[in-house]
């Protein structure tokens, strides 16, 4: 097994409520290598989304250190926002519960744009949609397809950027059981084929059981 794509050491995050500081994450450490998947579970408010936001630089650390693909970030550090933005552009793919497609672009053009921004203009963007089962909808717009089809396109968009790490925050949370299972099948199959690392935040224990490792935030604070 190679070096971790993602390594977290002593991560802490909290917020002020009234006159008190409430701890959300405390002294958390973890690592995920290429080809591995980690499920993050826990009760509502346990910090699942907060953790994923920290892992891609959308929130700042109170304490600790995060390293992604060799880039290291501490609670304080000059130029962190610029470095995080570059990682999100080229290295970290993020899949949200709410589909993050541009409504004015077709599914195919959404994938092409994401691939271009990551510097991976390979011409294989349509193939990614086909691999995710929405090749026939490639020229349709997000509001012309079902929620499940749009989420598949969002997953295709992330894989097209050839990320080292994928962060998926409740990617099937808004879908019915059948569609959720289909999207999850696609996500895990392609993740294993490409060998990227995956961190999946979910309340769905069945989905979490498909990952290599489990982190239950309900027991960490």
Give residue spans per PLM region.
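ABC ATPase NBD coupling module
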Residues: 19, 73-93
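Helix-to-loop junction immediately C-terminal to a conserved catalytic motif
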Residues: 56
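Conserved ABC transporter NBD signature motif
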Residues: 64-75
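Conserved ABC ATPase signature
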Residues: 141-145, 149-151
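A short, proline-enriched helix->beta-strand linker immediately N-terminal to the Walker B motif
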Residues: 160-164
């Amino acid at each position: 097994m190679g070096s971790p794509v993602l390594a977290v050491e002593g991560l802490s995050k909290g917020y002020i409520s009234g006159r008190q500081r409430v701890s959300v994450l405390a002294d958390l450490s973890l690592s995920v290598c290429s080809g591995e998947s980690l499920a993050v579970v826990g009760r509502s408010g346990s910090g699942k989304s907060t953790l994923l936001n920290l892992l891609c630089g959308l929130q700042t650390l109170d304490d600790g250190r995060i390293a992604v693909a060799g880039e290291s970030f501490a609670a304080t550090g000059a130029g962190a926002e610029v470095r995080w933005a570059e990682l999100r552009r080229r290295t970290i793919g993020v899949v949200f519960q709410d589909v993050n497609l541009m409504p004015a672009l077709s599914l195919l053009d959404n994938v092409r744009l994401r691939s271009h921004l990551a510097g991976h203009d390979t011409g294989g963007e349509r193939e990614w949609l086909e691999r995710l089962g929405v090749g026939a909808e490639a020229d349709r717009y997000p509001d012309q397809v079902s929620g499940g089809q749009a989420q598949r396109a969002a997953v295709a968009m992330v894989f097209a950027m050839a990320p080292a790490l994928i962060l998926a925050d409740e990617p099937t949370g808004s879908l019915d059981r059948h569609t959720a299972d289909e999207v999850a099948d696609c996500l895990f199959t392609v993740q294993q084929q490409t060998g990227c690392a995956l961190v999946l935040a979910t309340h769905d224990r069945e989905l979490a059981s498909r990952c290599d490792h489990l982190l239950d935030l309900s027991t960490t604070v």
